[in-house]
């Protein structure tokens, strides 16, 4: 047998072994079929692509480190978090709280005060004000950081805080914040005393054993373990960010929280920080104990304050906690569901859950941006419009920029708010964080925000949608075949 024959045989054996691995893996059937399609439709390319991004490869050291995080959180909760109480909310939503606690260890905490920020100027001014008032620590974790425009004020406030002796730590994703890492900002921040770390570093050789498209998509800012922010907002100036993409300014929202939930989000941050820096988690706990002992007692829980629960998610697990929570919330909806997401690429199970929710008489409203910055995602999303519209789901296209807010409101009494898009990448691959909101007052604020988006949106009509060109339908259906991989 010549060399060509040996190569063909090797390729066949490798493809067969990969196909068997796909079939016997615990991934969804739609994702498995999509990978098999890519593998055999593009013989050599399919093998290469699968070896690079086909599995949630964290690397051995990182995977072992991730396994330590659950014990770290348990110890963190025992030392720093208030005692667990039964969530005071409706039984149907209390069951969601129990699900999150059982799978993640994070409990619902009451007595928090919240403020929803929906304007970039208000968000950045609040960031700067809290950093300027910091006495002990400033913890920042973002997918995208760009030190331009109005963001410069935040980074400068961080440097001033470090100069006052406040411990300031910034964790930014290597790929999402690539322009930040190429700039002079990391050096300037470190020179001022700010600890700066790259999350999930990428490299040509590294991608052979660590999947390079697994990203840290979290957006968190914590000050003195007392105040915390999370939501869809990256640390960028929308007036300058991706202006050549033709989608307009990004539209985001952030929830400012004060109370025990800030300590829960601190646990998420410190776990990520320790993994990236190979810090000893026990030493981190001891260090935190010293900080907390030196801090004055915080304000007591606000009577009737917001009941919130942190829902972290990360790769390297067969579970998709946020996905499970979302499906459970849809299943217990009785009156109205409103969803805002920039990227909508559901799997068959989530699609069917949305359809069945609408068919049983619940008003289901899905708000999407009219223009997105990914052509593949745009075509993949459109492939799902017709079955949703036929089932009675209301589709609204927001035309005031790229709507980037990720929120779900159920019956005006429960909400999910955070960083998670409605696609399999967010559910299964990225490091994400969401808040489950159980208090009607905070849910009402989020609901009012989504109603404001609805006022600036136009409806998609089924009859008009069915009249689109055949070539568009063909492209949408082709892209849908690989949509579980997007």
Where are these regions (language model features)?
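N-terminal localization/anchoring segments of enzymes in phospholipid and broader phosphate metabolism
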Residues: 1-324, 328, 332, 372, ...
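Helical hairpin unit composed of two closely spaced alpha helices linked by a short loop
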Residues: 343-365, 369, 374
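Short, solvent-exposed amphipathic alpha-helical segments in soluble enzyme
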Residues: 353-357, 383, 452
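CN hydrolase (nitrilase-like) catalytic-core segments centered on the catalytic cysteine
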Residues: 380, 392
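Active-site donor-binding acidic/aromatic loop of nucleotide-activated sugar
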Residues: 395-399
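Catalytic-core elements of nucleic-acid end-processing and repair enzymes
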Residues: 406
């Amino acid at each position: 047998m010549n060399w060509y024959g040996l190569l063909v045989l090797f390729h066949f054996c490798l493809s067969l072994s990969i196909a068997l691995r796909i079939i016997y893996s615990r991934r969804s059937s739609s994702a498995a079929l999509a990978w098999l399609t890519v593998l055999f439709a593009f013989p050599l390319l399919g093998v290469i692509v699968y070896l690079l991004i086909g599995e949630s490869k964290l690397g051995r050291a990182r995977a072992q480190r991730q396994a330590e995080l659950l014990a770290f959180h348990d110890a963190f909760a025992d030392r720093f978090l208030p005692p667990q109480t039964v969530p005071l909310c409706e039984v149907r939503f209390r069951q969601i709280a129990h699900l999150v606690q059982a799978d993640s260890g994070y409990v619902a905490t009451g007595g928090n005060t919240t403020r929803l920020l929906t304007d970039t100027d208000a968000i950045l001014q609040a960031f700067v004000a809290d950093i300027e008032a910091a006495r002990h620590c400033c913890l920042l974790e973002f997918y995208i950081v760009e030190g331009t425009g109005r963001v410069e004020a935040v980074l400068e406030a961080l440097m001033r805080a470090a100069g006052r002796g406040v411990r300031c730590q910034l964790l930014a994703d290597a790929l999402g914040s690539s322009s930040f890492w190429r700039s002079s900002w990391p050096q300037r921040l470190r020179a001022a005393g700010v600890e700066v770390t790259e999350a999930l570093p990428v490299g040509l050789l590294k991608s052979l054993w660590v999947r390079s498209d697994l990203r840290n998509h979290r957006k968190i800012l914590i000050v003195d373990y007392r105040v915390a922010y999370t939501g869809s907002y990256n640390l960028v100036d929308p007036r300058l960010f991706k202006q050549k993409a033709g989608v307009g300014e990004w539209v985001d929202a952030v929830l400012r929280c004060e109370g025990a939930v800030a300590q829960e989000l601190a646990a998420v941050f410190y776990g990520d920080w320790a993994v990236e820096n190979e810090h000893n988690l026990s030493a981190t706990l001891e260090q935190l104990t010293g900080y907390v002992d030196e801090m004055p007692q915080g304000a007591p829980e606000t009577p009737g304050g917001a009941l919130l629960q942190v829902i972290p998610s990360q790769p390297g697990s067969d579970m998709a906690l946020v996905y499970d929570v979302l499906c459970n919330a849809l299943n217990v909806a009785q009156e109205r569901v409103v969803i805002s997401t920039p990227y909508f690429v559901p799997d068959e199970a989530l699609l069917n859950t949305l359809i069945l929710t609408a068919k049983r008489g619940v008003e289901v409203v899905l708000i999407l941006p009219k223009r997105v910055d990914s052509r593949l995602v745009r075509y993949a999303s459109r492939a799902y419009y017709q079955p949703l519209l036929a089932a009675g789901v209301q589709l609204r296209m927001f035309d005031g920029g790229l709507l980037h807010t990720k929120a779900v409101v159920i019956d005006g009494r429960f909400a999910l708010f955070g960083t998670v898009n409605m696609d399999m990448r967010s559910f299964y691959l990225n490091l994400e964080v969401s808040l489950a909101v159980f208090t009607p007052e905070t849910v009402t604020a989020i609901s009012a925000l989504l109603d404001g988006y609805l006022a600036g949106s136009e409806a998609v009509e089924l009859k008009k949608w069915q009249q689109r060109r055949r070539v568009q339908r063909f492209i949408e259906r082709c892209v849908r075949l690989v949509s579980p991989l997007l």
